[in-house]
Amino acid sequence: WSVLTETSLYNSMSTWGDNYLVANVWYTSHLWTHWRYTQDKEFLAKAFPVMWDCAQFWFHRLIEDRGFDSTKDEQERVRNYTPAYKFDPDGTFVAPNEFSAEQHDNQTEDGTAHAQQMIYYLFQNLSDAIGILGVENTGLTTEDVAKLNLYLEKTDKGLHTETYTGSWGATYNGVKTGEKLLREWKYSPFDISND
């Protein structure tokens, strides 16, 4: 369920972002989009097992949020010019060690916005598909549905905000001190990256 996602027209590949494990969710999202466009229940019934297999991968891969403390290794923090920040665990499920598709100079982190939003979208689509097809037509047990509902309830949705502190200047990339930002990272602040 993980692939190299940087494939060119000439069939060559790149290992940039080679830990892009959420690619499977990206691919299965197109199955749901096809259903939404066509309303073809026969297609949805064929697509459902693929979407469910993808969800099972994430049931095993997601971890309970472990929080983050940039001050644990003070020498490393200073060497990388990382600001001091700390987040306590919040009890949600997060995708471990993912990268943000829009940022290239920050390390991977648990619970990036892109990964979390895609995974939550998959779980929501499956819940909707069960409602459309009827649980009896999906091959799922009541335990399977309960597990999906648990993950749907406890998975971090990938929507976090912060207030820009002005640490890179009063205005940085058009953002003014005190303005609210939508985060790409669950923990790392806006000013962590030069991208």
Predicted regions and their residues:
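Catalytic cores of extracellular degradative/oxidative enzymes
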Residues: 1-22, 32-33, 38, 42, ...
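Structural recognition of the beta-strand scaffold that forms the well-ordered cores
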Residues: 1-3, 26, 93-97
